[in-house]
Amino acid sequence: MEFSASLRDNKVMRWSVLAITSLTLFASYFFTDVLSPLEDMLIRDLHWDGSQYGFFSGQYSFLNIIGFIILGGVILDRLGIRRTGLWFTILMLLGASVKYYALTSYFNNGGFGYDFFNSFWVDFKPSVKLASLGFMIFGLGSEMAGITLTKVVVKWFKGKELALAMGLQVSVSRIGTAAVFVIAPAFAKTGGLTSPVIFGLALIFIGLLSFIVYMIYDLKLDNQVQGLLAGEEEIFRWSDMTKVVANRGFVYISMLCVLFYACVFPFLKFATNLMINKYGVSSDIAGEIVFILPFGTVLLTPIIGYFIDRKGKGASIMILGSILLVLVHLVFAFLPGNIYFALGGMFILGVAFSLVPSALWPAVPKIVPDQYLGSAFAMIFWVQNIGLWLFPMLIGSVREWSNPGVSAALQEGKDVLFDYTAPMFMLVLVGVVALLFAILLRKADASKGYGLELPNERK
């Protein structure tokens, strides 16, 4: 169905909408990784260890993996973009505030709630438990806000520059991730551990205000089209789940998604520490090396998306990106601690992280019929969050297992280093499985005719 002339037909207006909502997305991704370059400070100042840090990092996805993200999808379908986006952006702010409070000296010196969080699970610090609670609340709000913002892009760009707009949206999220590895260490050096966290909290508040501004334009658009847009949106039905999971191509692309992303985002939470321990650089330099990955994706993702939109080859591009992923983690696992290997590895990982997402997300509508698309995206995000929850804990646990006594020595102020061979080799194995699913997806495309190798044209 074509939309009647409306605000969305005004090129300046729809790109302005993308810019406004991108502030919310930027804030979400910045705050998600704000502590990633600061693990050494968490160990030294708050006496966390690798397992506790890994546990905390994984809690971002906990509420999502137990089904709340699917419930959120139902809420989005039932209540629409405005109310859903507002509620979950507020939830982001709430979770971020709890996480910040858990890291403050007031709380850790016996402030409100300390005794309660110290009364159970005594092997973990109270700050770990409260920060994890805040992070899981934030994670639910962040993921649902992200899905809502994706729906915003579809609403305003359908039939127009949709692929480019989605590519730019991905780029904004990568800028948010990249900024952490430059800004957070600098802020922490001058203002302490909580300084970059409160900066991220301020960004979340600005993102909330930005979404409120967007709501005004969204209401105007709905009034103009008189329900045409709402009429095209699919209502989530539980019965759709069985039809979706019976689709072999959907299973392959979902597994590729969870395994590929599990080798990137959880890795980033340990990447700064890897650079410090294996390559012998300072925390500032380590953050700048890690910055290469998201910065590279900012530039490459829209370009690759533009290419796929017009030339196709999506399935082949996913295979290529998966091969690069395996090679990168082999470099980090086994090659010597030469800084040039670190620089080259992060650059190639950035290329891989541009190739696969650029091809993966536009492929979903080719594999899944339109009437099940809402259910499909909810399930993919759900499976992806399982990986984002599980793998930080796995990486942290494998690192602790392969480095007995190192965290304890660091807490005592001793000059010791982590060996990252074992956790990186684990990611190599995960990457190999991701590559196998990319190959299976290419074969399924050849037999089922999904059109993944064809340009991204609407069916």
Language model: regions and residue ranges:
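Cytoplasmic membrane-interface "Motif A"-like loop-to-helix N-cap segments
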Residues: 77-89, 309-323
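Extracytoplasmic gate region of multi-pass secondary transporters
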Residues: 35-39, 247-301, 391-395
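C-terminal transmembrane helical hairpin of 12-TM major facilitator-type secondary transporters
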Residues: 314-360
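Symmetry-related core transmembrane helices of the 12-TM Major Facilitator Superfamily/SLC fold
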Residues: 195-214, 421-439
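Central cavity-lining transmembrane alpha-helices of secondary-active solute carriers
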Residues: 58-74, 291-304
